[in-house]
Amino acid sequence: MSVKFLLGRAGSGKTSYIIDSITEQLKAAPDGDPIIFLVPEQATFQMEQAILRRSDISGFSRLHILSFQRLSQKVLEEQGGIAKADLSDTGKEMIIKNILLQRKDDLEILEKVAVKSGFSEKLSRLISEARMYEITPEMLEQISQELDLIHLKQKLQEISQVFTDYETFLQHQGYHHQEDRLSKAGQKMEGNNISFLAGSTCYIDGFSGFTPQELKLLEGLLTKCSNIELALTLPPQFTGKIDDELHLFHPTLKTYNQVWELAVNNDIEIKKSKHFPNENEEHRSASSLPRFKDNPALAHLEKEWGKNKINPYDSEPTGLSIVEGTNLRNEIDKIAREIKLLVRDHGMRYKDIAVIVRELESYEPVIKAVFNDYKIPHFLDRKEPVHHHPLVEFLRSSVETVISNWDYEPLFRMLKTGLLPISSEEIFQVENYVLAHGISGKDWKKQGKWNFIANFDLERENIAPSNRNKQYLSEINSIKGKVRDTLLEFDSKLRGINKSESLSAQFKNQEAEEDNLLSVREISTYLWELIEQLQIEYQLEEWSLEAEERKDFVEMQLHNQLWDTVIDLLDQMVTFLGEQKVTLSEYLQIIESGLANIKLGLLPATLDQVLVGTADRSRYHEIKVLFMAGVSDGLYPAKIDDDGIIDDRERITLRQHDVEFAPTTEQKLYQEQYLIYNVLTQPSQKLYLSYPAADSEGRTMSPSTIISDIQEMFPELFQEYQNDGPENDEDFRQYIIDGKKAVSNLIKLINKVGHPEKLAEDKQQLLAYLINEHPDLFYSTPEIKALDYKKSLSPLTQEVIDKLYPNKIATSVSGLESFCQCPFRHFAEQNLRLKEREYFRLEPASLGLFYHAGLKLFWDKLQENNLTWHKLKTEEREALVSEIVEVLSERLKNRILLASERYKYFKKKLHELLSRAVEVLSWYSDDKGFYPVGSEIGFGKDEPLSTLELELPSFPNKKVQLKGRIDRIDTGKKDGDLYLRVIDYKGKSKNLELRDLYYGLDLQLAAYMTVAMRNSDKLTGDQMFPGGMLYFGVENPVVPTDKPVSPAQARDKLKSTLKMRGYLIDDEEVLDLMTREDENSQDLLPYKLRTSSPGFYKNSKVLSEQEFLAVLNYTESKLVELAERVLSGEIAPYPYKDGGYSACTYCPYLAVCQFDLNYKEHKFWNVPAKGDYLSLILEEMEEVKE
């Protein structure tokens, strides 16, 4: 028995020596004594390939390439000890989660975090760590008795309790830890003959250190193998040096001493170490290491790295680059271009190239996107997490759906997995319905059909749904039936509900979930039955085949492996916890802890691909080119968080009591230097270091000290800066990856310099060459197509216009106002009929429906009971309002006002609002003055009043027909003449500005007055004259005062606040008829009489009869103008802007039209701030007459 150390720095030839030795032995004696090649788990495949690549080795039987786990497996297979399977990490975490749930009332220090997501994983890691370092629960308990630190003392006791429960559980089940396999294999090797090790030669490579369990197994190898040769990255002259944690080679020096001590303790012969290279370390030449024989610069880097005093390289280095990217994507784009050039121009294979990052989380999506864009085959060397996979989400959300009683969020998470027999279109359709109508779990479970529809006519009861709504409800209920039929039995089983129970009894039992305990076996069985019912296995197979057809081998392997993994997970739950009685919430926590721990190891799809890995995991052999990306501060060296259950100070305390866990963060930081050295020295020909100046969110990032250290070592090294695309004075050849990339980068450069003529001469020549010699390629690239893209919409074709409006435009005044605000908004609203998703909540539109319907019903009640508005007593008015509010609460949005305490509060506020509105409107109603003749009077087809139909001179064969509803029409008599007042309700106080009317932004009141005057015969039978058109703000304001006021003063202030706004006839007698107040009506209306002389103040909103009629005629002409613009097909975004407000401010279609002032096609039309618009209207109407 002997051991020999193979010592040398990185790249000195240790691994090549081992492979050469093995291949020579295999050639000399293919059936000779066993050869063991022990390497880290992730390096076994590479070592197999390295040996098989030798031209004269096509296979072997005597060679065993093993990791410690595989070695222990072989030992236990031969000697016994694996009758039961090892406990997997997933099983371990579920067991620990269950123990924490059972012990949650016994824990104090760990109580707050015991049920939190992720804590069971941390505790699982700690227990694994304890097992690897041969720490038992009893040791933790004993040390806790010796400590004076109360917090640590109690923490150790609680950890010991959980640890003991875990150990006891496994003993009863007959399982053992994965971590124990190494220790058990080491014990089996003591005193037993291991046949496959008899007479064997063992080579060990790729390790910088060993855990106590690995050392135990290594000790067994020392006593069983004939010869062991252990390779360590350690300069021979350091083997006798003082143990200094700060030294670069401290990790391997510590390992050397540990193995030496094992050999001495077991009387193993320690042969003279073999040094690499075979000359004195201090006198070797810069390029004497085999790996760097062709690159003196990389040899110099290896030699000088880690020294306190660096010897600068005296010339410009080759094969070494530093690049700063403006951002992470530009950094990876530069790497991708370099890889393509290396393969295309320098004869590299993709497998000769590796990309190393410190952590994959931020880089993975960018690397995938950019490498796929450049068509670079690559393999991510990591365990693939599966928490976003549809099957994993299905397992979580199916149980959560039952727990939450079919709550929206988990239910639709489950539906959107694609594993239920419901199409995506059906899911989106029913989701919109559920969100709009506030569908709850009990609504899903009831057998009856859903019949909620959007009711925009709250005044009438039991309105029959239209044919369109009937079809819609039929589709919705069909989808509801599919969901219900699929899940109801599963739900009943988990709740322990008998199918023969009445529906009311079932609902009564649904609230008893916490008391309804089922065994883990029962719940898992029901879950499995649902999986089988849905034929999920076949769906995964179908997805796998589809992925294979797309050549997405990563997704293909995910689907294939995950099915078996999930089956194994459920098996373990039943095996370990089968008879354990749990609530559904506890079961969910247990299965979630298991699912969170699933990570799948995927195989490379091909051998010739770029390996993308992390510095601490990935192992490389014979890599020629290495791209070290993300060399930023905080990543190299890594920030090692002290976030474990036992922190660094506590670990140091435990070490003082002879209990040593894994290294502290400080020790890991020391080891980080060795890790960096190991990465930097991997490539034999080229090393690229890069870092981004900003992260993905634009935050500034600083380069790592590695960059400054290398710049100090290589003062002649030129640092590159990678911007977003090429520069005009830059060598463009590196951007000519292929034709499309050449065009793409040329376009970027043209955009940057402003014009093709400003390109440098070589770029102009390339541009001309591509256009003349490869026009198809040039003009087919997306960037060139984008140059022709105009961010404007062409007018609709006449064919489309005729289909939309065959004979007429049937619309509303507000529809044409919408067109005036922005033609695209009108197109999206009226033609495309785009709508925002509706939610079950109170919105301005719903509130508008409420108070319009409330005021209409109040008027109807007055009519039914032969009451007059102004003669109602307060208590009578309040009784009517209360009755109306109760009626509307039942009708508004599926009884939303009764849905919760919050909405019941809104109901109260709406009651106050309606009550105030009715009170204020009574001030304007007097049967001796102006009094309503109708409320919410419709005009249009099948309405009391005729359609407002206007001729369109530019389109003789078409007309515009306007429909709508007038909130209130009042009339009053003066000297036998009937005057008309039109009132429109708004959610808040609003002015009518002639400027807005002139430009077509506010035509509603004037159009309504025109409709009323044209329909005078139907309203009163008499001719009517204009009296006023007013907006009434339905609001209940709080009026501020600077001192206490009397009720009369408060009433006066309220009048001023709630006055109607608009335009009135300039007749004082008519205006006095407008209110029933004893005092002058000007407190309630928008006018003010002069006191010193007859007439109105300048700011009074009054018009003469001639002016009134001119305004109404102008309104008609404006409506015609807008209708003709609609018929011309105008749909391009052209929003109005008024000061700081524009049509885009609250527009829901902004994301659709993509209005952007950076494009010349896009601009606002501005509404002038001031002007005498009455004069303009009068002038234009005078011109029309002429």
Swiss-Prot record:
The broad enzyme category this protein falls into is hydrolase
Pfam families according to UniProt:
ADDB_N, PDDEXK_1
Question: Which InterPro entries does the entry link to?
Answer: ADDB_N (IPR049035), DNA_helicase_suAddB (IPR014140), DNA_helicase_UvrD-like_C (IPR014017), P-loop_NTPase (IPR027417), PDDEXK-like_dom_sf (IPR011604), PDDEXK_AddAB-type (IPR038726)
**Cofactor(s) the record lists:** Mg(2+); [4Fe-4S] cluster
Per UniProt, the keywords (alphabetical) are: 4Fe-4S, ATP-binding, DNA damage, DNA repair, DNA-binding, Exonuclease, Helicase, Hydrolase, Iron, Iron-sulfur, Metal-binding, Nuclease, Nucleotide-binding
Q: Where is the UvrD-like helicase C-terminal domain?
A: 288-620
Q: What EC number(s) is this enzyme filed under?
A: 3.1.-.-
| Molecular functions per Gene Ontology | 4 iron, 4 sulfur cluster binding; 5'-3' exonuclease activity; ATP binding; double-stranded DNA binding; helicase activity; metal ion binding
Q: What else is known?
A: Despite having conserved helicase domains, this subunit does not have helicase activity.
| Chain residues that bind [4Fe-4S] cluster | 822, 1144, 1147, 1153
Q: Where is the UvrD-like helicase ATP-binding domain?
A: 1-308
Cystine bridges: none
Q: Which domain of life is it from?
A: Bacteria
Protein name from the UniProt record? ATP-dependent helicase/deoxyribonuclease subunit B
The subunit field of the Swiss-Prot or TrEMBL record says: Heterodimer of AddA and AddB.
**What does the entry give for GO biological process?**
double-strand break repair via homologous recombination
Family the UniProt entry places it in: Belongs to the helicase family. AddB/RexB type 1 subfamily.
